[in-house]
Amino acid sequence: MITLTGHTLTIEEMKRLLLEGEGVTACPNSMQKVAECREVVEKIVEDGKVVYGITTGFGKFSDVLIQKDDVKALQHNLIQSHACGIGDPFPEEVSRGMLILRANTMLKGVSGVRPLVVNMLLEFVNRKIHPVVPQQGSLGASGDLAPLSHLALVLLGEGEVFYKGKRVHAMVALTEEGLEPIELEAKEGLALINGTQAMTAQGVLSYIEAEATAYQAEFIASMTIEGLQGIIDAFDENVHKARGYKEQVEVASRIRDILHDSKLTTKQGELRVQDAYSLRCIPQVHGASWQVLNYVKEKLEIEMNAATDNPLIFDGGEKVISGGNFHGQPIAFAMDFLKVGMAELANISERRIERLVNPQLNDLPPFLSPEPGLQSGAMIMQYAAASLVSENKTLAHPASVDSIPSSANQEDHVSMGTIASRHAHQIIQNVRRVLSIEMICAMQAAEYRGIENMSTVTKSFYHQGRQQVPSITNDRIFSTDIENIAYWLKTNYSIKERLDVNAAL
């Protein structure tokens, strides 16, 4: 059980919450702050003060005063009218993440909701009732209004949820779990939907997958180095310390550890003086992608614990301030950066695939075919990889450079951060498939070189891979092989043992 405080949530905890289904509870001190802040909102309503989002309309209607008797209707109307999401739903892990992050930001005690609202969000998390949230429709400022409105709907007993493996009406799940839908009161609708939790939840899942994929890329690249009898000198510690990038040094170190007892790597001048860049520059390129990942992780962990709604309440109600923390620009930039960093792992992987299948670049059978000419072998796998990296180049175009004014030009600059997050996740799926193709080719090359000559680590990795797909002894439908390896990499290859390279993988 992970305790939410509003201040301390980490990526490592989100892994447990999203991928392992761990439960959550609220810190009592944080809940006390929530209750105290709520008293301020109720006094504002009682006194009839004019405060944006509490006693006024929203967006361009911020100058419209709402009567005390209409405050509840205002919140309900807000949720229904803003639930304009379209397209396929986010993965369940993302909608679960949205619930967790929304509760966490409310626990900072500056949003003005009742403790009841926070508790309801946590009930949904712990009972694994996950909102069906369409992926499209957010501008990323004022936050993720449309996606979060679909999240808020289910608290009211409206909309749809994923529950026990099925997509059902929210009331079906609430009834089965013995929960009553809530009725929103002053400010609560706005507090639920005005924030960056859709782009951030998708960003967190993307980061978690990207981190695992980046480690896997090192094991796969190491197997390719063996298949091509690569020069190990290029990974010498002195080379990488001379440049000074920590991540580059770490990648080189891990690859040296993976290959330390390999009989397939060569020394400088033994077969050739230098390798091509796609082998020789693995630490430089992969290391640069790790720099991106480290940047993204830092920004996500800030945003996961950020108050992103509007207005915010401070000093016991002395200050109720309309600001712009809902603006998703920091996450938009981070996700666009993640797109580029991950796309580059696929770019260099595809070039290594080419070196594995092109007989002009190696002494292996053409296209790793068991019977060149009669059988095409891995020829079209390289085409597929080329297609995926080309698609990534389109997806990697920065969403954050775009902005379209909305709400009659009141909201005249927006982040498009949710688009960036969604595209980052798609790029990661493509990268994993490119790496899957490289792994299939590298395993085949290893067989030609002699499996007994592989390092202890790559040999273990090879045998696990062969449990997913057989050797290429005849042409077959290779799309199945690619998807099988990709699924295995995504779901069954633990990164927890990534640094213990002598352990069984």
From Swiss-Prot:
UniProt-listed Enzyme Commission number(s): 4.3.1.3
Pfam families, alphabetized: Lyase_aromatic
Pathway note: Amino-acid degradation; L-histidine degradation into L-glutamate; N-formimidoyl-L-glutamate from L-histidine: step 1/3
PTM entry text: Contains an active site 4-methylidene-imidazol-5-one (MIO), which is formed autocatalytically by cyclization and dehydration of residues Ala-Ser-Gly.
Primary location group: cytoplasm
InterPro entries for this protein: Aromatic_Lyase, Fumarase/histidase_N, HutH, L-Aspartase-like, Phe/His_NH3-lyase_AS
UniProt subcellular location: Cytoplasm
Matching SUPFAM superfamilies: L-aspartase-like
Any one Gene Ontology molecular-function term assigned to this protein's record: histidine ammonia-lyase activity
UniProt superkingdom: Bacteria
Coiled coil: none
Keyword terms of this UniProt record: Cytoplasm, Histidine metabolism, Lyase
NCBIfam families per UniProt: hutH (TIGR01225), PRK09367.1 (NF006871)
HAMAP family in the record: His_ammonia_lyase
Family recorded in the similarity comment: Belongs to the PAL/histidase family.
Descriptive protein name: Histidine ammonia-lyase
